[in-house]
Every structure is written in C-alpha cells, then in structure tokens.
Amino acid sequence: MSLDRPQVNSSEGYVASEIEAYVSNLFTQGPSGDFASDAIIEAADRKARHWTSAEGGELRAGSDGHKQAICAMFRETFNPYRPSVMAWPILNSEELRRLKSLPIWDIAVQTEGRARLNFAAYAQSVADPDMRATIMQNAWEENRHKEVLSNLVAAYGISLREEPEFRHPRDPEWAYLVTGYSESIDSFFAFGLFDLARRSGFFPMELVETFEPVMQEECRHILFFANWLAWHRANLRWYRRIHFELRVIAVWVHIAWLRIGMARMMDSPESAAHQDNNFTINGAQAVTPVAVGFLELMQLCLMENDRRFAGYDSRLSRPTTIPALARFVLGVGKFWTGLLGRRAR
C-alpha cells in the first residue's frame, strides 16, 4: 500500500471543491511521493487506531471542548492510503469462487456512493465550520471506500449491476441520520464477520490485510457519528430536541422497513443478483468452513467492536444501541440454553 493525494470527481457539484481543499491539507502534512516506506505506512495505520485528546478533564457532550476533540480525532487519525495501488493478491480458483459468491458487492458499492452524497449534502447545511469540515472529510473517505470496492471487483472480475442515479437528498439531515445509523448497524456485524474470515483462513491473509484499513476507517466513521449525535443533541433547544428524538425514532423505523423491503426484493425470483437477504446471519458460513451459531457470531461481533474502539479516547461517546441489543440477545440466548439444559437432565 502507499500514500496518495486525494482525487475528487469535480463533476459532482456538491461541495466537491471544498472537500478537495480540506482533505488536500491533510495530505500535505504527511510524506510526499507515490510510495511510502513500510515504516511510514505502519505509523499511519497505528495513528489511525490510537488517539487521545490533549484536552484535560471531562469532555462534556455539546461543549466546545467536546466538539474540538471530535474534529481533532477525525483529522489526526486520517490514514492516507491509496486505493489505486492497493496490491490485490492473486487468488486460486476456489478462493476466487468464494469471493465472488459473497452476496454483498452490489449493495456495498451502491451504499458507499450514496453515503458520500448524503454526507456531502448535509455538510452544506452545517453552520459550524469545524463540524462542516469534518463531515466533508467523512464524505471524501466514503468516496475512497467506493474506489476501494470498485477496484476490488474490477481486479477479480466480479460483475455488478448498473448503479442507480443518486440524487441530491431533499432532506439532508434525514439522509445523514439514515446513513449514519445504517453504517453503525452494518459495521458492528461486519467487524465480526471480517475477523471470522481472518481466523478461518478461507481467504488469503494478504487480501484480509489489504482491506483492513477500510474496516478501521468504518470504526472511525461511526465513532464520529456517535459523538456528532451527542454534540448535536446537547446543543438543541428543548422543543427542537423533542422533534429530533421523534425523528430518530422514525429513522429506526425507516431503516427496519428498508431492510424488510430489501429482503423481499432479494427473495423474489426476478432478482438477478441472488443476493442473501440475511447475510449478517448466514454470512458466517460464507467466510468460514466451520459452522458458527448466531449467538457465537454475536459474541464475536461484540468482542471486535470493543477491540476496534479501544484505542480511542475513552471520554468520547461510543455507539450503544446495537451493542446493547446484541448483549440482550446473548443474555436471553444463554438463559434459554441453560434452561433447556436443566430440563434435559
């Protein structure tokens, strides 16, 4: 892997020039040249995983110190890897079959493209210059994720359906909330599945390691989103806070409805993609030859979630909803398993 200057598609009019200018400043702080030494790359990777604010004392949600810490974390943990020169390893026929069979590629590429648009659109509505710049950087990084995925599918000959046209969202805040919460859900389960793939050896370690920076970057993204939520909530007047919380509830309902609709669409005979609508559950069998139960997968997701967040300042907020639900499911599952075990005796 190497370090790179950013490339932004200037044909996309929404704040593209602002994103390019801001992220370019991040690159000028690092080493120059097309390729960096292994030591520099390792240092950049390490910096992306460990960060503590220089601000002493409590980081009270909504305070200026909290805001400065959030934005500094995102800026200072930036990892300038270059998608265009990622070394995609050669796969044998069985490894290639496994990779192509993963039912995620169309959705993954489209999701990153939509996230880029939604984040950039919301950035335009943010008055605070620090938060605006950080959300613009997030939009740029979403675009980089799409580049990584596009290069991967091209390298391995994975065919994708034509992408739908992405339109500027009519309600940028709604789009930002839906995207942020959706990423928080998907990343939680992706952490566990990714580690399962690493442990199983089902895919070459070179491929897993090549994709690792993207996984950690997703952790940074949802860490920022969780803290943006805390900061935003704390700075709303009480009547706007009520409206916002009702909107958050509506977002969760909307996401659930989208997932149900996606499942129905993928189960239909007309679906050419034949993608698995329950990949989070069944996906474990696609990345390991060993049978993995749902509760075991939940435990692994929790462990990986905790591990990836462990390097960041403990005073920053963490995503709580999905981990709490996973712990509840684990608790109920263990209780039920124990109850059945006692009855069997």
Short names for language-model regions:
Residues M1-A133, A155-E162, P169, A234-W238, ...:
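Terminal targeting/low-complexity segments that flank the catalytic cores of oxidoreductases
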Residues A108-R116, N138-V153, T179-A190, V214-F225:
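Alpha-helical transition-metal enzyme core signature, strongest for iron centers
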Residues A133-Q137, E209-E212:
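Short, charged, amphipathic alpha-helical segments
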Residues K146-R198:
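Active-site-adjacent scaffolding segments
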Residues E147, N151-A154, I158, L223-A230, ...:
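Charged/polar positions within long, soluble alpha-helices
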Residues T179-W238, E245:
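Glycine- and acidic-residue-rich phosphate-binding/metal-coordinating active-site segment common to enzymes
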